[in-house]
Every structure is written in structure tokens, then in C-alpha cells.
Amino acid sequence: MAVVDLFDLPREGVLLGIDPGTATIGVAATDRIRMMASPVETILKKKLAPSLERLLHIYDERAAVGLIVGLPLNVDGSMGPRAQSVRTLVSSLLKVRDLPVTFQDERYSSAEAGDIMRAAGATRRNREARIDASAAAVILQDALSRLERRP
């Protein structure tokens, strides 16, 4: 299936969102009716193969129909080394399993996730442990908002 446009993802079913970082991959999922996105877990990215295996396990466990990947664009919208690293990760994932993947601009998602967690009263330690999964939920919720405005 490879990389597709957001509007080409299946119209129904669970979507998984990820916030790929240098040391971790934050994972979030929608509910079946795509009303909201929730943090699922943070995968430690020590080695690529086990990280991708865990991600695909979550994908299967949740019966997901598509993957939304946060793309860390530069402030001006251009692609830098971090964005290229994410594209390489997705390429590696697609070599393991052919599934529908789309990219979502993730600028400021970690800051927004931190603000949400602070407002909810999360301790600093809790925020640090869950920030990547929470950022994945922000990325996924942004994609859901875009899907609501589907032409």
C-alpha cells in the first residue's frame, strides 16, 4: 500500500499514530469510530527490528487499518535530517509489512502534549514517561480534525 494521502486511508476503523523520536516511538490509537485519539505506549528504540515488531504487534492487536506518522518538519516547512530519519524508518517498516501510511506535520506536537499533561495535573516524572505517546495522540487528533473537514 505504501505512503498514501490522508484522505485515501480507509474511512472506517482504528488508526494508529506514531511520534518517532531518536530514542523512542510514541504510539497512540483512535477508538473504532474515530472520535478521539489516546496515548497507547512509548516504545524504546534500542534496535530497529524489535521496535518495528512491537509497533506491528500493537497495530494488529488494535486491528488498525492505517498508520499516521508524525513528520518533524522544520519551522519553515522544509525537511531536515530528523524528517529524513522518519522517512527512513517508514521505509524500513514498509519493507516488513505493506500497510497504508500517511505523514502528518508534527511541529509543536510535543510542546502541545506537555501543555495538555500539565493542565491535567500530571507530575513532571509522569509527563517525561508519557510525553512521546501523548505527542502521538496530538498528531493523531490533528489528523482526525483534518479528516472531519474531508472534501
From Swiss-Prot:
PANTHER family for this protein: POLYNUCLEOTIDYL TRANSFERASE, RIBONUCLEASE H-LIKE SUPERFAMILY PROTEIN
A Pfam family annotated for this UniProt entry: RuvX
CDD domains, per database record: YqgF
Organism: Hyphomonas neptunium (strain ATCC 15444)
InterPro entries in the record: RNaseH-like_sf, YqgF, YqgF/RNaseH-like_dom, YqgF/RNaseH-like_dom_sf
Keyword terms, alphabetized: Cytoplasm, Hydrolase, Nuclease, Ribosome biogenesis
Similarity annotation: Belongs to the YqgF nuclease family.
Its biological purpose: Could be a nuclease involved in processing of the 5'-end of pre-16S rRNA.
A GO molecular function held by the record: nuclease activity
Gene Ontology biological-process entries: rRNA 5'-end processing
Record-given protein name: Putative pre-16S rRNA nuclease
Stretches that traverse the bilayer: none
